[in-house]
């Protein structure tokens, strides 16, 4: 289902409202539930509970659908992570590159610094590893964006 905001000025009316905030929060919650359930499914598989793993996987698929529904509304006011325009592939690539760039330039280095200051060197190293991965992702999205023209 593709959701569209109805009415004159609906886009301007949604931006920065409590409903806009609620959509972003709901999108984050559904997205996190999806990833948690996939992790739980992996654990259930390892522990020998394939039926439970299937339950988690099926539910994760449902949560993905919910998150996509929220994005159908959110795309009309911008990417919930970057605020940039999303919807068409070219815009999606730019928003994805911007998000990954923020993660490798700012977020993960800051997280690593804090973890190290608090004595969690192993977690700091994990964050530093992720920063490298995010830099690679940003480069791939940027390259793909450039090939679109």
Where are these regions (language model features)?
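Non-heme di-metal
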Residues: 2-149
């Amino acid at each position: 289902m593709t959701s569209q905001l109805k009415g004159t000025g609906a886009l301007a009316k949604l931006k920065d409202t409590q409903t806009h905030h609620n959509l972003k929060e709901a999108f984050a919650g559904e997205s996190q539930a999806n990833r948690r359930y996939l992790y739980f499914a992996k654990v259930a598989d390892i522990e020998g509970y394939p039926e439970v793993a299937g339950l988690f996987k099926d539910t994760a698929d449902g949560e993905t659908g919910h998150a996509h529904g929220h994005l159908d509304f959110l795309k009309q006011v911008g990417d919930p992570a970057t605020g940039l325009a999303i919807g068409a592939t070219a815009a999606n690539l730019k928003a994805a590159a911007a998000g990954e760039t923020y993660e490798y330039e700012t977020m993960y280095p800051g997280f690593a610094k804090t973890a190290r200051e608090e004595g969690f060197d192993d977690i700091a190293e994990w964050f530093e590893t992720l920063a490298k991965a995010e830099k690679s992702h940003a480069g791939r999205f940027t390259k793909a964006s450039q090939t679109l023209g």
